[in-house]
Structures are given as C-alpha cells and as structure tokens.
Amino acid sequence: MERDQHQEICNDGGLLCESKEVSVNNHNSDAVEESEDTITSGNQEVSPANGPTLPILQKIIDCSDKIKILKDEHALVSNQVQEIKNCSLVEPEISRALQLLTTKLGALEKQYLEESSERKRLYNEVIELKGNIRVFCRCRPLNQAEIANGCASVAEFDTTQENELQILSSDSSKKHFKFDHVFKPDDGQETVFAQTKPIVTSVLDGYNVCIFAYGQTGTGKTFTMEGTPENRGVNYRTLEELFRCSESKSHLMKFELSVSMLEVYNEKIRDLLVDNSNQPPKKLEVKQSAEGTQEVPGLVEAQVYNTDGVWDLLKKGYAVRSVGSTAANEQSSRSHCLLRVTVKGENLINGQRTRSHLWLVDLAGSERVGKVEVEGERLKESQFINKSLSALGDVISALASKTSHIPYRNSKLTHMLQNSLGGDCKTLMFVQISPSSADLGETLCSLNFASRVRGIESGPARKQADVSELLKSKQMAEKLKHEEKETKKLQDNVQSLQLRLTAREHICRGLQDKVRDLEFQLAEERKTRIKQESRALATASSTTTTTSRHLRETLPTIIEKKPPLAPTRMRMPLRRITNFMPQQQPSQGHSKRFSDTTFKENNNSNRRSSSMDVNTLMKPRRSSIAFRPAPAPSAIASSNKTIMPRRRVSIATLRPEPSSLSSMETPSRPPPSFRGDPRKARYSKLFSPDRNLVTPNAMKSSRFMKSPLGGGGSSWKPSHPTVIALQKKAVVWSPLKFKNRRPSLVAIRSSASSSSASDLLRREQ
C-alpha cells in the first residue's frame, strides 16, 4: 500500500517523490534491521496468530529494489525534462539552422538538375559515338531435336571479349564477327535488357528509338522481343522501365504513354488493337506527315497508366497476330509485328514539351522454301516475308554505300521504318542466330547482314519537339512575318505621306511667297494707278474750258446735218462698247475748225497718263444721240435766237479686264476708221464721255456700269429712249478680284465742272 502511494506521488511530480524518498529509505533501513534481527534471533520466534514473518521481509526487500528502479527512472525523466528546457532556449538557433538547410536543399536541387542534364548530354554523346545503329548478336542454345539429330554448335565465344564471335565454316575455317555486344546461349532476358535499357531511356529525353529483331525462322526473335509470362521479353521490360523512370522524374517532368500495335501481313497493314467486329477491317496506309515523319492514320492508340494495362494490351495483340506451323518452327510468325509507344513529356520547370516514339519490331524470319516445306497459303506468306526482308536488305545496302536514292517505298515495312533506319533515330538491332551446323548458311547470311547494318552512319539523333507546339510555333512565326510585312507597308505609307506632306508644305510656302509678292505688286500698282488717275483728273479739269468753247462752235453745224455713218466697207464690225476715244485722223478741209494746239495737248496728256499699248485697246464703239426735232421755219424767222436741241449721249461701259489694271485712261488718238472723215472725228470728239466719269468706281456685282450722273448730285433721266449696242464677250477675272476690296479712288466729276457744263447748255438754249 505504501509502495503504491509512493509510486503515485512519483507519477504526479518529481518534488513529492524526492520529499518522500528519505522517509522511505529510513523505513526500509529500519525494516531491514528488524528483519535481520529476527533472522539472527532464530526461527523460533513465530507468532501463532500472524504466522511466519520471513515472507513479509522478502516483500519489503523486493519493494526496496523497485523503489531503486523507480528512482533511476525518475532521474532519467528529470534529465530529459532538463534537456527539453535547454532546447527551448536554443529555438532561434534551430530555426536559423532550418533556414540554412532549406537554402542548401534548394541549391542541391538546382545542382542536381544541372548534373542530370549534363549526364543526359554525356550519355547521349556516348551512344552517338558508339553509333546511331547499334547491333547486338544473340545466339540461342541447341534444342532437343538438333541434339537428337547430332548437330554440332558452330558458334564459338570468347569470355574475355564480349563483342566478338567466331563461326566455324564448312571448310574448318573460322570467320570473325564483331558487334556492339554478343550474348551467349546461357544469357537470360535480364542480361539482354540490361544492355538494352540505356538506349530505351533516351525516349524519355525526347529522342526517337527503334529496336528490332532480325534472323532466320526459329532463332528466337519472338522470344527476345515478347518472351513468356514467366520470362518476359524486351517489350514488356521496356515499358516497365519507362513507367519506373517517369515516376522517378514526376517532380520534374510529366509523361503520358500510349501504345499502338500493328502487323504487316502479305504487304497489308492490320491493326491488332482494334475491337473484333463483324465489319470488315479498315484499310490502313502509310502517310507522310507535315513534319516529314511516317504515320498510319486511323491506327488505334490506347493510353496506358501502369504495367498491368500494358500487359493486357500486349496479350490482346499477340492473340490475334498471324502465326502458323512450318517444318522449321511449330509457332512461326507469319507477319512483321510492330509495337509503337508514344511518349509525350512536359517539363514542369520551363514548360518545354516533347513527343517521341519508341518502335519495338519483331520481324518475321527469313525462310528457304525448299527447307521449310511449305505450300499453298504458307508459301504465299513466305514469299511476301522474303520480299519485305529483301527490300530491307536493299535499304541497308544503299545506306551503307551512301547512295543518293534509298528505296524505302519498295515495302510497307521499310516505309514505316524509314525514320528509324536513316533518320534522326537511335536504332538497336538484335541479330538472332542458330548455333546448329544445319543452319550454317542462314547464320552466315544473318551475320553478314548485321555487319552491313553496323556500318551505317546516319548522323546524330536529335530531340523531337511536340508536333502541336511546333505547329503553334510555325503559326506564330507566320503571323509574326505577316505582321512585319504589314508594319513595313504601314511604315512605307507613313514615309510616303511624310514626303508628300513635305512637298505640299514646300509648295504651300512657295504659294505663300507668291501671294505676298502679288500683294506687294498689287499695292505698287494701286499706288501707280492712284498717281495716274490724279494726273488724269488734273488734265481733265484743264481741258474743260477748251471743250466748252468747242461745243459752242460746233453745235450750230450739228443741228443742220446729222453725222453720217462711215461707209459699210470701211466700217468695223460691232464690238463691245468701250470708254476709249477713237484716234483722230488729220483732216485737210476742216483743219481750221480745230486748233492744232488742242489736239497736241490732248495727245500729250493721254500719252503721259497711259502706260499700256494704245493700239491693243482701241476698239470701235457706237453711241446714241437724242435731240429735239427742228422747229418750223416761221418760228425760226420770228426768233432772233438760235434754238439748239437738247442732246445727251448715253454710253454703256464694260468693266476693264484684269490685265488692263495698270492703265485705265482713254487714248487721245482716234481710231483709223475716223481719220478719213473729219466730221465723224469732230462728233466723236464732241460727244465722247469724260474720262473721269467712265472709270468704274468699285468692283460691284453688275457687269456693266451706268451712265455717269449729272452735276449737282441729282439723278438725271433722258427724255428720249437710249440705245445700247453690246457684244457679249467672256471676261477673265483676276484671282485677286475680291482681295482687299476698296472703292475706286477716281472721284466723280466735281460740282464745278458739272455746273459749268450745265450753264453752258442753258445759255445755248
């Protein structure tokens, strides 16, 4: 009871256990002493009620031993607690250490990736140095039938040389053959796959790989490639290794595996994974893809996730493969079986994708028709098998001799293996031979063929990018090229527009300069015109008095006779009515009426005021004169005064042409048509309008100007109708027509001159 309490106290806490330790020890020591005294005193002291005391002492001793054990355990627990307390004090150091380890782990992972990529590169380089097409030779052991027939082995192997083989020929000579590796008859499937595994794993790195077995019938090709459920061959072991490698690289790469299986039977392609149905099999053909690889459209491609699924597919395909019995082999393959494994990989770090193929080919054996004793359907199969193998031999010979043309299309088999034999593919060939002396000829043929294959140099293999990614890249490249072309076109258009804009700006600046020059010229011409008009006004005012005197002298003569028109032949055709004076012809009969000084003054003043050629501006004009009929003779006789009719000349003037802006004065010389008739010249001189009045005041909307107004500022209407003779003519306007429109600076006839003319007419009446 006391022990249990002590144990409970010890379980509750170390302090209570330590406090009770002394009392327990004292109690134990007392008990031990009492027991010793009792024992030493002898066994005679026995209590009849309690019985013997020896078992109690033994129990006490046992309890003391247990207490010691508990004490040791307590000390151990105390030490652990103390260590935990010490660890809690160094927690920051632990966190720092963890961070350091994490950093080192990241660096190691990065270094691992670099080393892994370097290992892949070096490994692939070693494979390429050995040759893209590697040849392994495998010799099967003698079977029971051959041993029973007394056939000897003609193959000799050197244990020190793993890649050499000697064949004893019929003349007792030895022929040496050298390959990448030679497997002896006692080598198992594991040994064979151990040498095959390095090239198989290249498919995970993005390389195309092809493994095929060649040899005569009955040499173990199907056993090497397919194997048995107990001793599986290369096909199953290869897929198993691919799954194992893909799982080990799952943190770096993501892989997807799919399997297709077909056979070439009598030069016809047959899908071995298609579901059996009553429908006839679909015809399959070899086609070349856009990337240059050979594909079989319509072929079933089953995705696999583990080795069990792979084995189920392989058993399904092997079950429907064409197999027949011959004299050489009871289970002879009558077709070429091809297993294609498609591996799609994606790098989880940089996103790079690959798509590669692994071809596992079990070729049908070459046969001698006479030896295998076949006929009928088997004979036809043998002929097709030998034909396809002969085409394969032609391809190998062409590749070895490096001819320009390789006859891949001579057979469906060689057409499908085109990339594997002469392309960027890593190829491995198993040449299967028989050691029997009865098959010596076929063995030598197979070994010679394998030697030619080993001598082929097809160049280094390269990685296969994913077709979908390649197509996307091509589309993006084409789109980029198209965009570059469009950008170049737009840039050319922009440059041409900039050139055109520069040319337009240059033209605009030139036109602006021309406009400024024209404005300057116009301003100068206006100044010149103002000066000329000022001089013309001064000249007109000086000649007003002379004109009044001439009117008084010539009016009586005009009343008596109407001025005749010029003869028809001499008359000029009617033209536009102008405000220019006709030139005066010299007259012999009436030269005294008009003073020479008057004509000279007028001519001199007109010549000074005009700056343009007079001959080009003089044109015939027509005037209309209105006058009152003459009175009766009695009225004339009774009147002492001479009654003069009221007359007025109405003239329609046309706006001057833009080219005639430099000078608007009327020439003083009369036209040539009036030179022969002095009276016409007199009337033209008499009734010609004043130069100051016929000059237009401003550029108005009307094409013609009215007759000049009378003096006094009041409008005057004629009492007789006015006749206007016009001739329509197109007028060319100046582009500066409405530029800075200003009224004419020519003043209307002054009131002084107007009043003098009206007073003169009133006195004459």
Curated annotation (Swiss-Prot):
Coiled-coil residue windows: 469-534
Assigned keywords, A-Z: ATP-binding, Coiled coil, Microtubule, Motor protein, Nucleotide-binding
Pfam families per record: Kinesin
Residues given in the record as ATP binding sites: 215-222
Domain Kinesin motor: 132-456
CDD domains in UniProt: KISc_C_terminal
PROSITE patterns named among the record's database cross-references: KINESIN_MOTOR_1 (PS00411), KINESIN_MOTOR_2 (PS50067)
Gene3D superfamilies: Kinesin motor domain
Record's signal peptide: none
Swiss-Prot/TrEMBL GO biological process terms: microtubule-based movement
Protein name, as recorded: Kinesin-like protein KIN-14S
Annotated source species: Arabidopsis thaliana (Mouse-ear cress)
Record gene name: KIN14S
